[in-house]
């Protein structure tokens, strides 16, 4: 199977976790896009979705799925999204698509987080994929210097403005042994909106696309 076929397989497999008459949290990226396609096939069975990006909102609406603002819901039954990396503790790096802040808000609202990935995203130690940090523009240089102190090499993601109007620093060369501590430390730097480490709130279930089929990993 190609990588895209693996992504499609896990996107459709995630439908098993969607209950009727609920509002579904929906992520961003190529794997999440397959889940949105799958969601379109049961759109009359659900109330709608809360979306983590303008791109996902556009795709949901094009399929006729109602989109709710996060402020309109008290909680979500399930949130389905991909990841750039996931370790054995179900902690993730996310934010390659620059939607990390909204993704983190939706994950906090959700009772269950289903991570959908192909097997290439599974790692023993997080950090080979550059760690995205969303930053208020005026704090970019200050935050970059603070990230250097952590041993990372921050790179400004040129030409990218998040849906919230902020910028992204991608931190290279981090070997993240204690993901919760790193998440808390970076989130405490003034000017940081959020970091793309999902460690305090990791995934509850990972659906992993492999050549043998979809493998289910439970926290």
UniProtKB/Swiss-Prot annotation:
Known EC number: 5.3.1.6
GO cellular component, as recorded: cytosol
Chain coiled-coil ranges: none
Keyword Lipid biosynthesis: no
Active site (UniProt): 103
A GO term for molecular function: ribose-5-phosphate isomerase activity
InterPro entries: NagB/RpiA_transferase-like, Ribose5P_isomerase_typA_subgr, Ribose5P_isomerase_type_A
Isomerase in keyword set: yes
Pathway: Carbohydrate degradation; pentose phosphate pathway; D-ribose 5-phosphate from D-ribulose 5-phosphate (non-oxidative stage): step 1/1
Binding site for substrate: 28-31, 81-84, 94-97, 121
Chemical reaction(s) catalysed: aldehydo-D-ribose 5-phosphate = D-ribulose 5-phosphate
Gene Ontology biological process terms, A to Z: D-ribose metabolic process; pentose-phosphate shunt, non-oxidative branch
Keywords associated with the record: Isomerase
Top-level class of the enzyme under EC nomenclature: isomerase
NCBIfam families linked to this entry: PRK00702.1 (NF001924), rpiA (TIGR00021)
Family per similarity comment: Belongs to the ribose 5-phosphate isomerase family.
Function: Catalyzes the reversible conversion of ribose-5-phosphate to ribulose 5-phosphate.
Self-association state and partner proteins as the record states: Homodimer.
Protein name from the UniProt record: Ribose-5-phosphate isomerase A
Gene: rpiA
């Amino acid at each position: 199977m190609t990588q895209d076929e693996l992504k499609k397989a896990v996107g459709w497999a995630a439908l098993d976790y969607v209950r009727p008459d609920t509002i579904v949290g929906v992520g961003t990226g190529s794997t999440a896009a397959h889940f949105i396609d799958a969601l379109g096939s049961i759109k009359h069975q659900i109330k709608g979705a809360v979306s983590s990006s303008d791109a996902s909102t556009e795709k949901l609406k094009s399929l006729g799925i109602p989109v709710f603002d996060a402020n309109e819901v008290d909680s979500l039954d399930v949130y389905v999204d991909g990841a750039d990396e996931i370790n054995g503790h179900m902690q993730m790096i996310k934010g390659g698509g620059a939607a990390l802040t909204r993704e983190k808000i939706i994950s906090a609202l959700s009772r269950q987080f289903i991570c959908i990935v192909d097997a290439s995203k599974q790692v023993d130690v997080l950090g080979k994929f550059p760690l995205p940090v969303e930053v208020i523009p005026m704090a970019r240089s200050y935050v970059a210097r603070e990230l250097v102190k952590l041993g990372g090499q921050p790179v400004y993601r040129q030409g990218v403005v998040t849906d919230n109007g902020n910028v992204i620093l991608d931190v290279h060369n981090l070997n993240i042994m204690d993901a919760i501590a790193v998440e808390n430390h970076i989130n405490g730097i003034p000017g940081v909106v959020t970091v793309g480490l999902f460690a305090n709130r990791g995934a509850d279930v990972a659906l992993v696309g492999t050549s043998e089929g979809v493998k289910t990993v439970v926290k």
